[in-house]
Regions:
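Catalytic phosphate/metal-binding cores of nucleic-acid and nucleotide-processing enzymes, i.e., regions
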Residues: 1-204
C-alpha cells in the first residue's frame, strides 16, 4: 500500500531514534565514569587509559577487522602492584552479562569479549597483579560501585543460570569502592581500593 511519508512518517523512526539516544546516553555515562575514575587516582599511582576499540565508534560493531582489542580499560601501577581495571556502568540493579562480556554469538555459543575477562583472570594469577571488573550501579536505591575479580565473573558465568549479575552478588564477591558526589561529578576512593588489594596480597 502506498504511504505518503510527508503525512505518514515511518513508524519505526521513533523507536530507532530512542534506541540511538539510549546508546549515546550509555556511552556518555560510561565516559563520565571513566573520567571520574582517572581523576580519582592517588598521586602515587601511574594510570593509563587503554584506547577504545573502533567498534565503540561504529554502533557497537564488534566484528570490525581493524578494531583494537585491549584487555581492559585501565592499566594501573602503584608500587609494588600492578592492576587491570575494566569499568562498566548500569542504571539497573542487575548488569547483563553481555554488557561485560560482549555480544553472545549463538552459533559459536560464546560471548564475543570473553577472552578479555579470561586474559585478565590469567594475569591476576601472577603474584603482584590483580584484575577487576569495576561495576557502577548508578541509579535508584543502589548507587554503589564494586570491584569484582575477573575470576569471580568467570565463576559466575560457569555456575549461574542468570544472564545478569545483581548488585547483591557483586557486593558479596567484590570490594565496595567508596564514592562521594561533588556538585555534578563523582569521585571514587581508588586509593582505598588499592590499599585493600595491597593488604590482600601481603596476607596471601
Amino acid at each position: 500500500m502506498y504511504r505518503n511519508s510527508e503525512y505518514y512518517p515511518d513508524p519505526t523512526a521513533g523507536a530507532a531514534l530512542r534506541q540511538l539516544y539510549r546508546k549515546e546516553k550509555d556511552l556518555n555515562t560510561g565516559k563520565q565514569f571513566e573520567a571520574a575514575w582517572k581523576k580519582s587516582m592517588p598521586p602515587d599511582a601511574w594510570c593509563y587509559r587503554l584506547k577504545d576499540s573502533a567498534a565503540s565508534y561504529y554502533g557497537g560493531n564488534e566484528s570490525l577487522s581493524f578494531s583494537i582489542d585491549n584487555i581492559c580499560d585501565f592499566d594501573v601501577y602503584r608500587y609494588p602492584m600492578h592492576h587491570y581495571f575494566e569499568l562498566k556502568t548500569i542504571e539497573t540493579p542487575s548488569i547483563p552479562l553481555e554488557k561485560i562480556l560482549g555480544r553472545f554469538d549463538r552459533d559459536k555459543q560464546k560471548y564475543h569479549k570473553l577472552k578479555h575477562i579470561t586474559d585478565m583472570a590469567a594475569a591476576a594469577a601472577y603474584r603482584g597483579q590483580t584484575a577487576h571488573v569495576v561495576i557502577n550501579y548508578y541509579r535508584g536505591k543502589v548507587n554503589r560501585t564494586f570491584a569484582v575479580p575477573a575470576s569471580a565473573v568467570l565463576d559466575y558465568l560457569n555456575t549461574q543460570t542468570r544472564k545478569s549479575i545483581p548488585w547483591q552478588w557483586a557486593a558479596l564477591h567484590g570490594i565496595e569502592v567508596e564514592q562521594h558526589q561533588l556538585r555534578v561529578h563523582w569521585r571514587y576512593d581508588v586509593d582505598g581500593l588499592l590499599r585493600k588489594l595491597e593488604e590482600m596480597e601481603d596476607n596471601a
